[in-house]
From Swiss-Prot:
Its EC number is 7.1.1.-. It catalyses: a plastoquinone + NADH + (n+1) H(+)(in) = a plastoquinol + NAD(+) + n H(+)(out); a plastoquinone + NADPH + (n+1) H(+)(in) = a plastoquinol + NADP(+) + n H(+)(out). This is NAD(P)H-quinone oxidoreductase subunit H, chloroplastic. Belongs to the complex I 49 kDa subunit family. NDH shuttles electrons from NAD(P)H:plastoquinone, via FMN and iron-sulfur (Fe-S) centers, to quinones in the photosynthetic chain and possibly in a chloroplast respiratory chain. The immediate electron acceptor for the enzyme in this species is believed to be plastoquinone. Couples the redox reaction to proton translocation, and thus conserves the redox energy in a proton gradient.
Length: 393
């Protein structure tokens, strides 16, 4: 009697684009030898909407609602980078109060993004309970956003030279209460997850990246800091008013999925420290730049003349981008979010190149999953933290 036939050839499997662990419309073509991954080819572009080309025939204010659709879980950062470029090109000053409000909103957005990374990451590796806990805290962040901006997501809050509105009455006290509560919630996560033996079995030593590799691949954010390189643009570039606060760059040296988890968890507590200091030290004054500029320096036109150019939340349609090249960047939750902007002395950018952290961090995935088990793909991909709106643009 013949024994059961065994399969000798390799198997090619499509994972995604609608697999729940793909976090969007990512498709992986996997070559498997039983449970072992031999090769992995990511297929991108299912969510491509031409965001860079759209920017070339919109003014900055017209384009602001589009940018919140890149990384739609951390929209404050895409708005920040969109106004930072024209501000630097036009040498527009941001009032101190507006800068503090921006920092508060950016760090709240970082917390919300890390929370919605943590829940699905835990669900991917078999722990469903934290998925419900993170929504409890994330809802409080969105309540704060809604009170300040009118929107839970897609806030459209940043403006050239400031922000769209001042903080409402009572908002600061409400946010301080949230900070006190959230520190206990993070301690609860650590107690529930960090020492869990099943969790450690799934993430420890999985997806290791060395410090040399992260630099060669151009990775950034928690991916970079989890491999022993304490590089954070908030410390390096000192944009907005981050250098006025007392906080530490969070990093680990192991470079595995556990290290990336620990970095993000620690970053949430650091964000709370920054928010608390900003709320307690927020200065008075205007929340927007109320400057008015004139084209024609030789004569003094009427205030309602076309020669006037208004800065602030309602910039004139005649607001021009200087004929220069500029690269601006911020430390987004997923890494370095940058824009290469070329002005052409017109209302529209001549070129608007986006440097998305998720797209670049994703490039190392095929190398990480080779010779790993099929089940480890969810762990490794989850630890990278991608949003396909930003990857495909």
């Amino acid at each position: 009697m013949n024994g059961p036939a065994t399969r000798k050839d390799l198997m090619i499997v499509n994972m995604g684009p609608h697999h729940p662990s793909m976090h969007g419309v990512l498709r992986l073509i996997l070559t498997l030898d039983g449970e072992d991954v031999i090769d992995c080819e990511p297929i991108l572009g299912y969510l491509h909407r031409g965001m860079e080309k759209i920017a070339e025939n919109r003014t900055i204010i017209q384009y602001l609602p589009y940018v919140t659709r890149w990384d739609y879980l951390a929209t404050m950062f895409t708005e920040a980078i969109t106004v930072n470029g024209p501000e630097q090109l036009g040498n527009i000053q941001v009032p101190k109060r507006a800068s503090y409000i921006r920092v508060i909103m950016l760090e709240l957005s970082r917390i919300a993004s890390h929370l919605l990374w943590l829940g699905p990451f835990m669900a991917d590796i078999g722990a469903q309970t934290p998925f419900f806990y993170i929504f409890r805290e994330r809802e409080l962040v969105y309540d704060l956003f809604e009170a300040a901006t009118g929107m839970r997501m897609m806030h459209n809050f940043f403006r050239i030279g400031g922000v769209a509105a001042d903080l409402p009455h009572g908002w600061i006290d409400k946010c301080l209460d949230f900070c006190d509560y959230f520190l206990t919630a993070v301690a609860e996560y650590q107690k529930l997850i960090t020492q869990n033996p099943i969790f450690l079995e799934r993430v420890e030593g999985v997806g290791i990246i060395s410090g040399e590799e992260v630099i060669n691949w151009g990775l950034s954010g928690p991916m970079l800091r989890a491999s022993g390189i304490p590089w954070d643009l908030r410390k390096v570039d000192r944009y907005e008013c981050y250098d006025e606060f007392d906080w530490e760059v969070q990093w680990q040296k192991e470079g595995d999925s556990l290290a990336r988890y620990l970095v993000r968890l620690a970053e949430m507590t650091e964000s709370v420290k920054i928010i608390q200091q900003a709320l307690e030290g927020i200065p008075g004054g205007p929340y927007e730049n109320l400057e008015i500029r004139s084209f024609d320096r030789a004569r003094s036109p009427e205030w309602n003349d076309f020669d006037y150019r208004f800065i602030s939340k309602k910039p004139s349609p005649t607001f021009e981008l200087a004929k220069q090249e500029l690269y601006v960047r911020v430390e987004a939750p997923k890494g370095e979010l940058g824009i290469f902007l070329i002005g052409d002395q017109g209302g529209f950018p001549w070129r608007w190149k986006i440097r998305p952290p998720g797209f670049i961090n994703l490039q190392i995935l095929p190398q990480l999953v080779k010779r790993m088990k099929l089940a480890d793909i969810m762990t490794i991909l989850g630890s990278i933290d991608i949003i396909m709106g930003e990857v495909d643009r």
